[in-house]
C-alpha cells in the first residue's frame, strides 16, 4: 500500500486543482465565448455525416438546443466502430461551438436507447483489437462527460451496458417508465468498461452500484427513478418519445439563463464533486470570479432593475 500523502502535498494538489479550474473558467469567459461562433443554420437542420447518427441544431424558440439522434436500428443502436467515430466527430465539433447551449442524446429507433457495444462486431475482432476498442468507447463517453454545456440523456427504451454508460456521462437522465436500464457485463464474464464502475457509484452510491453490477440487474424506469439513477420518469406516449419530450422541456428551461454562467456552473459542480469541501469552495470562488467581469452579469442586473427579461449574449 502506498504511503499516505503528507498534508502539505495534499494542499499543493488542492491548490493545483483550483488553479487549473480557474484557468478553465478563464477560457470560458467572454473572450473565449465570443470566438468560434458557428454559422446560422435553418430550422431543425441536419448535419449529414451518416444516417447512424443524426445531429440536429434546433431553431426558433429552441435555438441553442442540439439533438444527437442515434439511428442504428439493425444493430439496436449498439456502439460499433463507425458509430463511435461519428459520435467522436460530432462531440468534437459541438464542444467548440459557442452557439450550443444544451445537448440532448436520444434514440430515433423505437424501443431502444442503446444496447451497448456491438457484440457481433466484437466477436469478429482479434483479441488484440478488443482492448483498443473498449478504450475508444471509454474515450468517447469521457468526451461526452466533458462537454462544457448541459447534456441530457432521453431514455425511451433499452439502455444496457455501454448504452447506460453513455447515459451516465450526461448531466441529467430522464426515462420512460417502460425503459430498461442496467450494467449487465458480468453476465458476459467482463466488467463495465465505459466508465460504469466509476459513474454508477457516483450517481446512486457505492453499495447499490455494486449490487446492480454484481447481479447484472436490469431496472425499469420507475425502479431507476427510485434509486436516483434518473431524474424524471414518464409514462410512455403513443409516439414512443416521452423521455425526449421531457428532455426538450428541460432544455428549454435552460435557454434563458446566462450562457457563460451555465458553462462555469457545470465546471464548478463537476470539479468540486471530486475534492473535499474546502477545495470545492475554493473552486467555486475561482469560477464565480470569472462571471463578474462579463457583460451578461451587468445585463442581468439591468434587466432586474428594469423589470424585463434579460437579453444575454454570452459575453
Swiss-Prot record:
Keywords: Acetylation, Branched-chain amino acid catabolism, Lyase, Mitochondrion, RNA-binding, Transit peptide. One of its GO terms (cellular component) is mitochondrion. The keyword Cell wall biogenesis/degradation does not apply. GO terms for molecular function: enoyl-CoA hydratase activity; itaconyl-CoA hydratase activity; methylglutaconyl-CoA hydratase activity; mRNA 3'-UTR binding; RNA binding. Pathway: Amino-acid degradation; L-leucine degradation; (S)-3-hydroxy-3-methylglutaryl-CoA from 3-isovaleryl-CoA: step 3/3. InterPro entries: ClpP/crotonase-like_dom_sf, Enoyl-CoA_hyd/isom_CS, Enoyl-CoA_hydra/iso, Enoyl-CoA_hydra_C. The keyword Mitochondrion applies. Signal peptide: none annotated. Residues 1-43 form a transit peptide. The modification N6-succinyllysine is found at residues 76, 85, 89, 120, 124, 136, 180, 187, 305. This is Methylglutaconyl-CoA hydratase, mitochondrial. It comes from Rattus norvegicus (Rat). The gene is Auh.
